[in-house]
Amino acid sequence: MSLDLTTLFTKKVTVVGDVMLDSYWTGPSNRISPEAPVPVVRVTGNEDRAGGAANVAINIAKLGAPCNLVGIVGEDKNAATLEGLVRAHEINPNFVITNTHPTITKLRILSRNQQLLRLDFEDNFADVDTKGIIEAFESSLNDSKVVIFSDYGKGSLASVQQMIQICRQKGIYSLVD
């Protein structure tokens, strides 16, 4: 099978992998905390962005390809925020929801264009039942010609070999981010 890259983004693409929410809190820092030798940031702004595989899907959509997104999220507010971010780019999210893990979230605190701290809210999804992700993956393949696997080592692609085999059986191109 050969893939004509000039027409790649006219075909439906399914992105599957580790989806996450990137949050940025920003503000000035003009003093050191009296409690510990750390800067105090007066938060004046915040922004949420799609991260990981969700960012890959947004980039694909911006190139003009219709796009599905498959990943695992928690049963929480951050999952709803992430879903809204990808839907804003006309991406069809097919998230597997688990109530045992939070949505992977990276919270960065910035001041004066400098990252001061990053807080990671995550558990590895490798122990989540893979049946759900396989079912979500297969149901997202309708009309897809290309699958992009986006692995950040968070466990969403624990069954990647099975997913690649499904792509081979269906004649779908597989790419790795």
Task: Tell me the role of every PLM-derived stretch.
Residues 1-30, 45-177:
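Ribokinase/PfkB-type carbohydrate-kinase core domain
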Residues 31-35:
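Flexible glycine/proline-rich, aromatic-decorated loop/lid segments
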Residues 37-44:
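Divalent-cation-assisted or electrostatically stabilized phosphate/pyrophosphate-binding catalytic cores
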